Structures are given as C-alpha cells and as structure tokens.
Amino acid sequence: MNFLRRRLSDSSFVANLPNGYMPDLQRPESSSSSPASPATERRHPQPLAASFSSPGSSLFSSFSGAMKQTPQAPSGLMEPPTPVTPVVQRPRILLVIDDAHTDWSKYFHGKKVNGDIEIRVEQAEFSELNLAAYVTGGCMVDMQVVRNGTKIVRSFKPDFILVRQHAYSMALAEDYRSLVIGLQYGGLPAVNSLYSVYNFCSKPWVFSQLIKIFHSLGPEKFPLVEQTFFPNHKPMLTAPNFPVVIKLGHAHAGMGKIKVENQHDYQDITSVVAMAKTYATTEAFIDSKYDIRIQKIGSNYKAYMRTSISGNWKANTGSAMLEQVAMTERYRLWVDSCSEMFGGLDICAVKAVHSKDGRDYIIEVMDSSMPLIGEHVEEDKQLMADLVVSKMSQLLVPGATVPSPLRPWGPQTKPAKSPGQGQLGPLLGQPQPRPPPQGGPRQAQSPQPPRSRSPSQQRLSPQGQQPVSPQSGSPQQQRSPGSPQLSRASGGSSPNQASKPSASLSSHNRPPVQGRSTSQQGEEPQKSASPHPHLNKSQSLTNSLSTSDTSHRGTPSEDEAKAETIRNLRKSFASLFSD
C-alpha cells in the first residue's frame, strides 16, 4: 500500500494519465476541515484512499454523463424541422376487358386505391389484346384499339383486371383462352379470378359443379334440372321423354339450343352434332311460366323475373317483360352456394325457370361476364367499380395485405443431459463416487473435471490418515437428490443398515460415471476400505472445488504447476505498477 500511495501521489504519474482519468487528485478536498483544525493530520490518509478509488468513480461519472447526454443529442437534432417530401406513387393500371358500348373510365373517375393512389383505366376487348408473360417480369400487354376512327397502340403492365367478356364462344368462333392463360401466367389478380374465368369456358364443366351442390343440399333446397351429357354423337340414340332441349357445345345468348319434339327430329339433330364435332347435352323441356335470375355483385343481391310476351319458348327471344322481385332466402341460398365454386365468384348470377305447375328448376350459372339487365344497370356497374377498388386495395397495396400468421413456437423441452453436464450434480446435492483409498489399486477411468459435493456429503481422505471409528469403514452412502432426510437418518444408523439402501439407490437412480463401466461401479463399495471422516465445518464452493481437486489429483506435479501460476500472476501484477 505504501508503494501505491507513493505512486499515485506522484505528480508526474498523474500528468501522464489520459484526459478524464483521476480528475479528483487535482481538485481541493471539499470535506477537509479548516487549517487550524488539529484533525487535519489525522485525516491526511483519507484523500489518498479517495484518490486510489477515484479512477473507478471517475470512469463511472464519465459514463453517467455520456448516458445523460445521449438522449439530448437526438432532441437537439430534431429541433429544426425538415419538410418531408411526399412520395408520389405511380397510378395503378386497371385493364377492363369489355366491348366499347360501356365506358368504364367514368365509373372509376375520382376513385383511388386506399384514398391516395390513382387508377388508370385501360379498356379493350379480347380481340384487341396481345401479351407476353414472364416468370419474373410479370405480363406486358399490347393493345390496339380504334376510338373515333383513330387507331391507338399502347403497351403497359396492368395491375388488375376486370373481365366483362366471354373468353370462349363456339358460335362466334372466338377462343381467347390463350390470353386468359397468359394473364394467369403473369400472376395478375382479377374479378372474377382468372382461374374461374378459364373454368367457365365450358358449360358442362360448370354444370358439374352444380351437380355437386345438388348432391350436397338436396333437391328441395337446390332444384337442379335433369340433364344428360354426351361427349359426341355416337351415344345419342334416343331420349327418354319428349320434348327435349339439346344444347350443342359452348355458346351464349341462346345460341346452339334446339327444341326437339319427337324421335325423328332427335335423329336429325344427332347428325348435326356429328358435323359440329363437339359435345352435347339434353334436358327435359320445361313449360315455364317465367324465368328467374338472381345476381350477386359483392354483397349486393338482386332478383328479377322475366315473362315472355311473344310466346317463344326462349324468354330472351322476342318480347318479354322484366321486373324486379323480392329477394327470398331460397334465392339467396342458390346464389351463395354457386358463388363458392372455383375458389369464389365475386360476381355471379343463377338462372332458373318457374314451371306452370309451380316448381323451380335451376338451369345455369353465369360469372362476371353476365349481361346486366333491369332498371339498375348503372347502379350495378357502380357496384362493380367499387368492388374492383376494394379488391385492388387488398391485393396491390403492401400495407393492406395481411401476412400469414407465424407458426407459434412449440413448448420448450429440456434437453437431454449430456455427459458434460454431470459437473452440476454436486451443486444440486446429487451423490458422486468417492476417490479410491490411498495406497489401494486405482480403477481405470478417463480424465474428468474436478467435482464438488455439498458440505454434508464431503468426506475427504487426508494423506496418511488412519481409520478413526468403525463407522467410517462402511461404504459411502449414496442417496437420491430429493431425499435430504434420508441422509440425516442414514448418518446415524449402523453400517449394515446404511449399506443396503445405498446399494439399491445407486443401482437404480445414479447414472454411470464417465469412463467407468457398470461392473466397476458395483465393485467400488467393496474395494473402498479407507475411512473418510465427516468435516466439522462447512466450506465454501471454492474450498470444495480445491479439496475435491486435491483428492482426485494425487500427484505433486500439479502443485508445482499451481505454484508456478501464482508466481506468474504476482509478476504480472507487479509489472502493472513498474516504470
């Protein structure tokens, strides 16, 4: 301490220190008394002691000051507010596939995605489009349209699609299914989905979905018309009842539908099917009183009734009277059930006929390409526009997309106890094997780290110590970790009574020690004959480790190595204060 006091009181030593270290040596002692006080000489060593501990306090004060100044720095930087430049996002391109009779741009005028992203509408028919789709580049659409006698050629990447036109019609020789495939290849979202648009390119395929609903709900809730499918003309021999309605291929607006009154006409139409080289369906003719149409646009429902005035069996041919009827729960069930097919239909309609005997028959379902009828056509178009904007807000804006839930973490299970974790056993009161007696034969065992025991379990074998009492000649008692009362009871029992429970507990509860076989563990209590008296005072964990290490070591070379280590530490400590 005298060396430290002289060294720390040296002015040259303080001058050579970096800035911020030991500033208290150069400050006057505030707690010292007046010069006339006789207690000054007695308190003279106190400034030295304070100066000795001043590096830690000065470092702590410097760190505290830095921590106090840290939150003030950002506030100072934030004082001059900088104007944030608004980020103008590019407008989203909406491709509406429809004819030129409806100008869809006016229905999207003023509408924005999430209220801040504009929508640019591009409208064209399937016949005016071409495209190229890429795996990573999306879909590039080429459009060539004629507006007011002017040909417009444009290329763009659409962000969303509204399909309002049929992609396939055999009657008009229109097949644009390849364009639907290209749009799907580019991963473009649409209303309705491109998956459903492609599936609606075959009416028998759609009718098969109605059959599933029919079997699910039953004929009372979902009255589906009886229909028969023929892949070609060969199986078309006769019909069970007449008159029948024959539908050839895939067509719209009543095209390809023929009413057959008798067997002779049926055979004639079979030859027409052979020339058409397509499939055909037959269904019983229903003498209808009126037609029913239930449409669904998003969450809006409407039901219409159409009655033929001209008397034609096709209600869409000639004169007809159309009126809106009440939306019943029966109609709602029909359209809701059909809207679930092909992954969901945002826009759909169900067509049915009401016979003169008062029964209903569902004959067809339509998708987003359905024609709009009635007095609320403008309202329906506005509903479609609102539905598209809602879908665009959900699918195109990253902030509106909801991520998928993360898989919850499973319950953490405790890992299996590795051999290296056996060192924690003494700290938890687990029994450990004692070392072999001095002078006895050493058992073959692998090198393992020193182990410690609790003070009540430690039994040491000092060098040259002889047995003191006959009780110490019994084998060491081993007990389970959760029975401290057993250790106290067995400590005062006879050797014979203590050896029996220890043998049973060691054979069932204690795992094998590293480097020892099971047979060696069973023979250990018999080979050990050297006494290990109890310690009369408790020891700290450091003393336990050192004494256990001494009992396991047994060679003087390790003592010399420890002494050499202590000497090296002393030299290192002395070099810190040397010149």
From Swiss-Prot:
The modification Phosphoserine is found at S9, S454, S461, S469, S474, S480, S483, S540. Residues 550-566 have a biased composition (Basic and acidic residues). It comes from the Eukaryota. Residues 15-83, 401-566 are annotated as: Disordered. InterPro entries: ATP_grasp_subdomain_1, PreATP-grasp_dom_sf, Synapsin, Synapsin_ATP-bd_dom, Synapsin_CS, Synapsin_P_site, Synapsin_pre-ATP-grasp_dom. Keywords: ATP-binding, Calcium, Cytoplasmic vesicle, Membrane, Nucleotide-binding, Phosphoprotein, Synapse. GO terms for biological process: neurotransmitter secretion; synaptic vesicle clustering; synaptic vesicle cycle. The keyword Calcium applies. Residues 399-530 are annotated as: J. Residues 30-39, 47-66, 418-431, 453-485, 536-549 have a biased composition (Low complexity). Residues 1-28 are annotated as: A. It is a peripheral membrane protein. GO terms for cellular component: extrinsic component of synaptic vesicle membrane; glutamatergic synapse; postsynaptic density; synapse; synaptic vesicle membrane. Pfam families: Synapsin, Synapsin_C, Synapsin_N. The keyword Plastid does not apply. Residues 486-529 have a biased composition (Polar residues). It is found in: Cytoplasmic vesicle, Secretory vesicle, Synaptic vesicle membrane. Belongs to the synapsin family. The A region binds phospholipids with a preference for negatively charged species. May be involved in the regulation of neurotransmitter release and synaptogenesis. Binds ATP with high affinity and ADP with a lower affinity. This is consistent with a catalytic role of the C-domain in which ADP would be dissociated by cellular ATP after bound ATP was hydrolyzed. Interacts with CAPON. Regulated by calcium. Calcium inhibits ATP binding to the C-domain. This is Synapsin-3. The lineage of its organism: Eukaryota, Metazoa, Chordata, Craniata, Vertebrata.
